[in-house]
Every structure is written in structure tokens, then in C-alpha cells.
UniProtKB/Swiss-Prot annotation:
<comment type="function">
    <text>Plays a role in peptidoglycan recycling by cleaving the terminal beta-1,4-linked N-acetylglucosamine (GlcNAc) from peptide-linked peptidoglycan fragments, giving rise to free GlcNAc, anhydro-N-acetylmuramic acid and anhydro-N-acetylmuramic acid-linked peptides.</text>
</comment>
<dbReference type="InterPro" id="IPR019800">
    <property type="entry name" value="Glyco_hydro_3_AS"/>
</dbReference>
<dbReference type="GO" id="GO:0005975">
    <property type="term" value="P:carbohydrate metabolic process"/>
</dbReference>
<dbReference type="GO" id="GO:0051301">
    <property type="term" value="P:cell division"/>
</dbReference>
<dbReference type="GO" id="GO:0009252">
    <property type="term" value="P:peptidoglycan biosynthetic process"/>
</dbReference>
<feature type="binding site">
    <location>
        <position position="127"/>
    </location>
    <ligand>
        <name>substrate</name>
    </ligand>
</feature>
<comment type="similarity">
    <text>Belongs to the glycosyl hydrolase 3 family. NagZ subfamily.</text>
</comment>
<keyword id="KW-0963">Cytoplasm</keyword>
<dbReference type="GO" id="GO:0008360">
    <property type="term" value="P:regulation of cell shape"/>
</dbReference>
<dbReference type="InterPro" id="IPR022956">
    <property type="entry name" value="Beta_hexosaminidase_bac"/>
</dbReference>
<dbReference type="InterPro" id="IPR036962">
    <property type="entry name" value="Glyco_hydro_3_N_sf"/>
</dbReference>
<dbReference type="InterPro" id="IPR017853">
    <property type="entry name" value="Glycoside_hydrolase_SF"/>
</dbReference>
<feature type="binding site">
    <location>
        <position position="60"/>
    </location>
    <ligand>
        <name>substrate</name>
    </ligand>
</feature>
<dbReference type="Pfam" id="PF00933">
    <property type="entry name" value="Glyco_hydro_3"/>
</dbReference>
<keyword id="KW-0133">Cell shape</keyword>
<feature type="binding site">
    <location>
        <position position="68"/>
    </location>
    <ligand>
        <name>substrate</name>
    </ligand>
</feature>
<keyword id="KW-0132">Cell division</keyword>
Length: 340
């Protein structure tokens, strides 16, 4: 059950054939797929029309430095800004607006929000709402409530917490040597509490090895995904692997081995990006048949609400939220400059 990427602005015949493979469930879009809104809408329409099966179309449109579509879209401030600048009431509107803009493009899912604690990690930084569970959790929950209000599934990442490793898992495999008790009493709490409230439809584990807990990265660890996430926390939603093309996943072997280990560990859907040869290797060599439960889980993430861009941007709610978020973005950039 792979989610793969596209090379450019248009769907090629080869990419169409890959998307039609029975082991491919969807795709993830990047900035390289975006020239302008009209082109992006045409690309998505082409995918929907040419590939004759349900495809989950996804993106990372978190806000801040991780916002794949910018020109013509609302500038979403980094998640840290909502707590740092005491704009908690805007968090729900941000979740709603981000989701609404993606739905208006016929995108099913934005992988959000980040639930990692702390700002020291190179990979996370101001993508995190905050450092303390008690203060960040209401903000994260409000953002999720905004997503859920319009019908977008929330994906909590990066389980059980990526915020306290300096290394960037895009570039290397990070190791977290802190005691097990610290991770369970601190980092895992946002996930635990939001799962208990039924707020998370999906979870994305980290490519981090928690040395005092298990020898494998969480994304390839049955301890983290089956024992802790499924059994202990009673999570019954979708588990996405983080991008198996990242250097942090290299600990698990080649692309086929990474995919096998992630599936065996408990992942339902696998992201494999920026490695077209790796995608072909996996599709040619992976011996895997998704279960009916896994198919049901992934189909549950498909968007249910139809909304046009013109209707959305004409609504008073969007116009007000758009302006408020633009103001917060300016305030956040000013705050960062003053506190650099």
C-alpha cells in the first residue's frame, strides 16, 4: 500500500501506470508539482480521471516552513506562533482554512498536525506547537477540531515524539537516548490524550531509534506500532510510515527491506518519495496483500465534502480567517527576527 510522488507539473504515462499498480493507494504532492493554482487543479483532475480507482491524494500543508503551495494560498504561520503569540483562538480557524483550501483543490489529506514537543530538533523546530503538554495540547486540539469540522482526517506526527533529537531524520537516523519513562511521561502524551478523545484518524511514526525502548526506528518497530500504539493506546486508525526514501529510514535496509519491515511492524500505508527507481523496486519485489481492514482504513481518509475555490474564498469566514492568519504570519516573522 504505497503512496508515491510525481516528477513535475503533469502526469506522465509512466506515472499513470505506477499509480494503477494494485499496491499503490495514493500519491503525495510537493512544491515541484505546483506552478500555479490552475495548473495544480488540472494535474489533480488528470490524475482522478486517468487512474481508474480511488486514490488518496495527499500533501504536507502544515504551515510555516512546511507549506508546499504558497502563491495564491493563505500564508499559514508556523504552529509555534499560535502559542508563542497567544493567538489560541486562531488555531481552530487555521485548521479549518487549511483543510478547506485543500478540499477545494480535490486533495483528500494534509499530513497535520505535528504533535512533537520542543523546538530543538532540526527537523521540527517551529513546526511544534510548544514544549509543554499542558499548554500545547489545547492549541493542537483546536487545530484538529478545525480540520475535523470540515471533514479532513487529522494525522498526528511523529509518534512517539521527534522533538528532542537534534539530528534531522531527512539526512540521518537520529537516536534518542533518553529514559523510557521520559518518553512515556512527556513526548507520547499528546498522542495518547488525543487518541483517547478520538481526535486522530491517522498516525505517522518517526524515523527515530529510541535506544532505551527498542533497537529499530519507530517506523519499523512492532514494539512501538503494535504493542504501544495499537494495544496499549488502543489506536485503530491508519498508520502511515514517514517517507521511506529519507536517510533516516536507511537503517532498515534497501527500499524493499524498508517497506517489508514497516509493514511487518504495523504500518498500513507507506510513503516512498523522491526515489522513482526505489518505487519500481518495491512494486516489482514486495510480496504483500493488504487486508480488508487496511483497505477500509485508507478509504476512510478520502474527503467527503465537495467545495469550490470560488465559493470558499467568497465566504466571510474564509475572508476573516485569511486576513487574521496573514497578520499573525507577519507578527510571527517579526517575533522571530527579534528573538534570533
Amino acid at each position: 500500500m504505497l503512496l508515491i510522488d510525481l516528477a513535475g507539473y503533469e502526469l506522465t504515462q509512466e506515472e499513470q501506470e505506477l499509480l494503477e499498480h494494485p499496491l499503490v493507494s495514493g500519491l503525495i504532492l510537493f512544491t515541484r508539482n505546483f506552478h500555479d493554482k490552475a495548473q495544480l487543479q488540472a494535474l489533480i483532475k488528470s490524475v482522478r480521471q486517468r487512474v481508474k480507482k480511488p486514490l488518496l491524494i495527499t500533501v504536507d500543508q502544515e504551515g510555516g516552513r512546511v507549506q508546499r503551495f504558497r502563491e495564491g494560498f493563505t500564508k499559514l504561520p508556523a504552529m509555534q506562533s499560535f502559542l508563542q503569540l497567544d493567538r489560541l483562538q486562531l488555531a481552530q480557524e487555521a485548521g479549518w482554512l487549511m483543510s478547506a483550501e485543500m478540499f477545494a483543490l480535490d486533495i483528500d489529506l494534509s499530513f497535520a498536525p505535528v504533535l512533537d514537543l520542543g523546538h530543538c530538533s532540526k527537523a521540527i523546530g517551529d513546526r511544534s506547537f510548544g514544549e509543554d503538554v499542558a499548554t500545547m495540547l489545547p492549541v493542537a486540539e483546536a487545530f484538529i477540531d478545525g480540520m475535523r469540522e470540515i471533514g479532513m482526517a487529522a494525522t498526528g506526527k511523529h509518534f512517539p515524539g521527534h522533538g528532542h533529537v537534534i539530528a534531522d531524520s531527512h539526512l540521518e537516523t537520529p537516536f534518542d537516548d533518553r529514559p523510557k519513562e521520559t518518553i512515556f511521561n512527556h513526548d507520547i502524551q499528546p498522542f495518547k490524550q488525543l487518541i483517547a478523545k478520538g481526535k486522530l484518524s491517522a498516525i505517522m511514526p518517526a524515523h527515530v531509534i529510541y535506544t532505551q525502548c527498542d533497537s529499530q526506528p519507530a517506523s519499523g518497530s512492532s514494539y512501538w506500532l503494535k504493542e504501544i500504539l495499537r494495544k496499549q493506546l488502543q489506536f485503530n486508525g491508519v498508520i502511515f510510515s514517514d517517507d521511506l526514501g529519507m536517510k533516516g529510514a536507511g537503517f532498515m535496509g534497501n527500499y524493499v527491506e524498508r517497506s517489508e519491515k514497516a509493514l511487518q511492524a504495523g504500518c498500513d500505508l507507506l510513503l516512498l518519495c523522491n526515489e522513482p527507481d526505489g518505487v519500481v523496486q518495491v512494486l516489482d519485489n514486495l510480496k504483500y496483500q493488504p487486508t480488508p481492514t487496511q483497505k477500509e482504513r485508507y478509504l476512510s481518509l478520502m474527503k467527503r465534502k465537495q467545495i469550490s475555490w470560488s465559493e470558499l474564498t467568497a465566504s466571510p469566514r474564509w475572508q476573516q480567517a485569511h486576513q487574521q492568519l496573514a497578520t499573525l504570519q507577519d507578527q510571527w516573522l517579526e517575533w522571530k527576527a527579534q528573538n534570533a
